[in-house]
Amino acid sequence: MTRAFNFSAGPATLPESVLRQAQAEMVEWNGVGASIVEISHRSADFMAVAAAAEADLRSLLSIPDDYAVLFTAGGATTIQALLPLNFAAPGQAADYVITGHWGKTAIKQAATSVDARIAADAQADGFVDIPPAASWTLSPHSAYVHITANETIHGVEFRDTPDVGTLPLFADFSSSIASEPLDISRYGLIYAGAQKNLGPVGISVVIVRRDLLERAGQPRADIFNYASHAARDSMLNTPPTWNWYVLGLTVKWMLEQGGVQEFARRNAEKAALVYGAIDGSGGFYRNLIKPAVRSRMNIPFFLPDEQLDALFVSESKAAGLLALKGHKAVGGIRASLYNAMPVAGAQALAAFMHDFQQRHG
């Protein structure tokens, strides 16, 4: 069976070689006589899997030694709720920059336990641009400044790290982590749900400067305490072992492919192919985002009417191009071009777009 090109925004496409390896090792792993999903998370065998995943992730992202790496169950929304509990004192403010749907989600999750202030909000302009950092209204004693590095629904991406002075910068990198080189030392904390660039759904990564873990935060159960998770190597409770294992395979695959420098090159090439098809269509396809902040990972676009949108989704699926329907919040079409999407997938989509316009334009 030939695999289609899967443009899903998440859970997203995984490298076929990773899927094949996971399939081969599902029933019996590494000569232990049992599946990886059956062995204890505290066994020497799984501890080696976990240690290798962290070592490879540190190598892939050039994570400094003064940053802890946590592997946590669940997704980014859970992390958003836990950030103020861990890093904001009772009554302290935290600043949020809203550049799309997920920025709104982040502040909503935090608002129950912190004075969540909007430092900048791009909604009035339809989330088509990112307000310059110099225009943000930051609280001088804020616990942190939170941004969403890439908005998967609206297709807006920070192309540079904003300067927030001495305040810790926290960022949701769920959809763009490992897509290009990143100077992690400019952030206090970054986090990412795995299901876009790092692996399967159900596990997330938190990369946090160790001195921030010393903050008292707010009263919380130990299971919600990131310092406790760091002290126990992310095994305070039973972790999602299968997800952690596949994440490790995916990170190793990225290293073998050439690392973040190589994926930056591929991702730029893929994005150029799809944006080229949009911009060269004479208005048949429309992307509303300001070019300077267009996402490389998630490209939303619109056809002249909703009937053509539906026909595009139907015909593209028949052509082996899956999950191109836009998010219900905005409609239209959306192509997600994460690391595991090969350049051939973007080429196939661009060719289909040209053919579709020739037949229906």
Swiss-Prot record:
UniProt-recorded Gene Ontology molecular function terms: O-phospho-L-serine:2-oxoglutarate aminotransferase activity; pyridoxal phosphate binding
UniProt record, GO biological process: L-serine biosynthetic process; pyridoxine biosynthetic process
Co-factor binding details: Binds 1 pyridoxal phosphate per subunit.
Superkingdom of origin: Bacteria
Names of required cofactors: pyridoxal 5'-phosphate
Chemical reaction(s) catalysed: O-phospho-L-serine + 2-oxoglutarate = 3-phosphooxypyruvate + L-glutamate; 4-(phosphooxy)-L-threonine + 2-oxoglutarate = (R)-3-hydroxy-2-oxo-4-phosphooxybutanoate + L-glutamate
UniProt keyword Lipoprotein present: no
E.C. code: 2.6.1.52
Pfam families: Aminotran_5 (PF00266)
Keyword Cytoplasm (UniProt): yes
Localization, UniProt: Cytoplasm
Binding-site list for pyridoxal 5'-phosphate: A76, T77, W102, T152, D172, Q195, N237, T238
Role of this protein: Catalyzes the reversible conversion of 3-phosphohydroxypyruvate to phosphoserine and of 3-hydroxy-2-oxo-4-phosphonooxybutanoate to phosphohydroxythreonine.
HAMAP family associated with the record: SerC_aminotrans_5
Subunit record text: Homodimer.
Name of this protein: Phosphoserine aminotransferase
Native source species: Xanthomonas euvesicatoria pv. vesicatoria (strain 85-10)
Gene that specifies this protein: serC
